[in-house]
């Protein structure tokens, strides 16, 4: 099924997934399209950050669901 991923710049990416896909696999698909490594991605759906080891089914993702991609930036120390 197809879901949508929105970036902070409001760019929308269409991603084909299966309900059995983990969030980590979805991040890999985003990397294939956008070149952003999964380690730098945070995925938010209905206001919650999604855990890499859980599946699309666990989060009740449906065709047309919109996920939000947030970049995980490392903070520096003083």
Curated annotation (Swiss-Prot):
Tissue expression pattern: Detected in stems and flower buds, but not in leaves, mature flowers and seedlings.
One Pfam family of this chain: ubiquitin
Record keyword Cytoplasm present: no
Gene3D superfamilies given in the database record: Phosphatidylinositol 3-kinase Catalytic Subunit, Chain A, domain 1
Keyword NAD: no
Residue numbers covered by the propeptide annotation in the UniProt entry: 77-78
Function: May function as a stable post-translational protein modifier.
Protein name: NEDD8-like protein RUB3
Keywords: Isopeptide bond, Ubl conjugation pathway
InterPro entries linked to this entry: Nedd8-like (IPR038738), Ubiquitin-like_dom (IPR000626), Ubiquitin-like_domsf (IPR029071), Ubiquitin_CS (IPR019954), Ubiquitin_dom (IPR019956), Ubiquitin_ubiquitin-like (IPR050158)
Superkingdom, natural source: Eukaryota
GO molecular function: mRNA binding
Location of cross-link Glycyl lysine isopeptide (Gly-Lys) (interchain with K-? in acceptor proteins): 76
């Amino acid at each position: 099924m197809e879901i949508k991923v929105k970036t902070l710049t409001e760019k929308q990416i269409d991603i084909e997934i299966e309900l059995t896909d983990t969030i980590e696999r979805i991040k890999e698909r985003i990397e294939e399209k956008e070149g952003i490594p999964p380690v730098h991605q945070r995925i938010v759906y209905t206001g919650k950050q999604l855990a890499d080891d859980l599946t699309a089914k666990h989060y009740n993702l449906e065709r047309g669901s919109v996920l939000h991609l947030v970049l995980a930036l490392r903070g520096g120390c003083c």
